[in-house]
Amino acid sequence: MQALLCALAGLALLRAGTGEWGQGPRDTPGRRAAESPSSPGDLAGSPGCDRHAAVQRRLDIMEETVEKTVEHLEAEVTGLLGLLEELASNLPTGPFSPKPDLLGDDGF
C-alpha cells in the first residue's frame, strides 16, 4: 500500500511539473517521455514519497507512544482503584463512622 501511495505521489509531482495539472503549457509526448522515470522504482526517491514516508514513520512512533502511555495509565488507575477499595474495606464500621462512598455512587 505504501509503495502505491509513493508511486501516486510521484506521478502527481511529475504531472504538476509538466503542466498536466498546473497552468503551464503541456509538453510534447517525446519530451515528457524523456523526463519521466523509466521504471516505477525510480519514484521511490521523489520528494513527495520521502515526505510521506517520513510522516508515516513519525505517525507510527506517535501511535506506539500513545499506546504505551494508555497501557501505563490503565495500570496506574487499576492500582489506585485497588488501593481505594482496600482502604474502604479496612475502615471501621459503626454508628459514628459510616462507610464512605469513595467511588461516588451516592446518587448525587
Swiss-Prot record:
<feature type="coiled-coil region">
    <location>
        <begin position="54"/>
        <end position="91"/>
    </location>
</feature>
<dbReference type="GO" id="GO:0005576">
    <property type="term" value="C:extracellular region"/>
</dbReference>
<dbReference type="Pfam" id="PF15205">
    <property type="entry name" value="PLAC9"/>
</dbReference>
<protein>
    <recommendedName>
        <fullName>Placenta-specific protein 9</fullName>
    </recommendedName>
</protein>
<dbReference type="InterPro" id="IPR027941">
    <property type="entry name" value="PLAC9"/>
</dbReference>
<feature type="region of interest" description="Disordered">
    <location>
        <begin position="89"/>
        <end position="108"/>
    </location>
</feature>
<comment type="similarity">
    <text>Belongs to the PLAC9 family.</text>
</comment>
<keyword id="KW-0175">Coiled coil</keyword>
<feature type="signal peptide">
    <location>
        <begin position="1"/>
        <end position="19"/>
    </location>
</feature>
<keyword id="KW-0732">Signal</keyword>
<keyword id="KW-0964">Secreted</keyword>
<feature type="region of interest" description="Disordered">
    <location>
        <begin position="18"/>
        <end position="49"/>
    </location>
</feature>
